[in-house]
Amino acid sequence: MQYGVILNYFYNAWIHSTFFSILQKIWEPFRRAYDNLAAVKLLRRGNRIQTLYESSLLSRILRFVLDIICRLFSAIAGFAAPAWKGSLIVRLCRGSFILNFEFLLGAFICAMFIMPHSYWNNGYAIVAAIGFLTLYLILVGSGKRKLMYPDKLGFPFMLFAIALVLSLLFSQNRSDSMRILLFFAAAFIFTYVIAADMRDAKQLFKLLAFIYAAVMVTAVYAIIQRKFNLVYANASLTDLKINSGIPGRVTSTLDNPNNYAEFLVLFMPLCAAFAGTRKNQLSCVALLIGLVFPAVALIMTYSRSGWISLMLAALIYVWLRNKKLIPLFIALALLAIPFLPSTIVTRLTTIVTSFLGSSGHIDSSAQYRFQLWESVGYMIRDYGVNGIGLGPASFASLSPLYDTVDGAVHTQSQYFELILETGILGFVSFMWLILRCIKDSVIARRRADGLVRALLIACTAAFVGIAFSCIVEYLWFYPRVLFAYFILLGITFAAIFMANPEAKATL
């Protein structure tokens, strides 16, 4: 991040203060204990399984198929080259800022999230994913890109994909499960295409600029919703009895305030990395100030899980950027509490009252989850090994047998949903995938600098932050959040490969 003169002054004053020295002495025993934890030592070990996976039969088959496709495109390109070499389309695309792969990919991702819910169709993402994959392979075949084999995304990624496909065998409603599997396939393609195509910080800059634009546009629209009273207090979204005075919760272009909060938690750290690494100090400050808009929008969602997730993401971001600023971060967070509007304080206190019952009334959303999870526990007991298949239809076919809460369409927890839908294999492979991704990002940041380093920190922060929301929300029920999650994963892989180029090298 670009620190100005004033910020540098306060920073130096802080790290040389007596109070900071005392905090360092208090922290040192905890740091030593952390370094000696068995789990930490395990995460720091090398990845032997990946080496075995890359030489496996499955990996060789996938490479063979991709090589055949690329050779086919290469032959077609060679045959047609004389005809289109001087064509108008080629002349327009050559050197164009707009008519190139990165611009089109970023523009679609931006459009995906700024399009209002009533106009969006998940089929757009499926068609776009297939189109971008085809275009990428054409570029590889014509020699414009270097092919990245899917095994570079890691064995856990492939294992999770296999678990999703195998879940079809045990599905309670195969047609609906197939529909959801198509959404996952599109999400995986976005991950692969982003990881494969992004080769340098300049390309990442383009993509992040579009993501920043999407976050800003949706934030401004959310503020407009509140300003012009386009949203109203809804008893189905908020317990109005203990949340008195809470206004309507903004949804922006998404369908639900929690969905929008999850989108912001996933992408705001990326926006912070994008803004904070601008070389021009004026643009850096302007872009950082712009983050006030999505922060305000997140507050207006009144999503308690979203608030906690973003605070956790911010804590991780500061931790990985500069641990010495952690006490200052905590102090500023505590000092901000007295200045919070009463409606926000009311909403935050319901977190405590929901679990302790100190107000004599448990929040209806918390009560709903507790009752639902009790029934889900029995469903997992009976179907947790193989799963019941993807999609709400499979859940709906079994839920009446377990006396679940009326109107429940999913488990209200990402982790419960993964076990129930995909079984143990799906849950373990997903957790392995994300933990490995976080581990690789933290390690890779030590070798990176500039935008790539900031981005690795931001991706780690986003994944850790959203992990809290996964406890009390099923993020992927709304497909655009599913796409956002795996777009973030693709950006993470791309940044890891840039920090460690040999990890992306083809065999």
Residue map of PLM features:
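Transmembrane signal-anchor hairpin modules in multi-pass inner-membrane enzymes, especially those
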Residues: 1-166, 172-176, 202-205, 209, ...
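Alpha-helical transmembrane segments of multi-pass inner-membrane proteins
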Residues: 108-109, 162-166, 189, 205-246, ...
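Hydrophobic core segments of transmembrane alpha-helices in multi-pass, intramembrane catalytic enzymes
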Residues: 124-134, 179-191, 258-274, 305-317, ...
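Transmembrane alpha-helices of multi-pass inner-membrane enzymes
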Residues: 130-135, 436, 451, 459-507
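Structural signal for the C-terminal ends of transmembrane alpha-helices
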Residues: 134-146, 193-202, 272-279, 315-323, ...
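Aromatic-anchored transmembrane helix interface
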Residues: 152-160, 174-196, 205-215, 262
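A membrane-periplasm/extracellular boundary helix in multi-pass inner-membrane enzymes
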Residues: 220, 226-229, 318-360, 364, ...
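Long extracytoplasmic/lumenal interhelical loops at the membrane interface
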Residues: 232, 246, 359-374, 378, ...
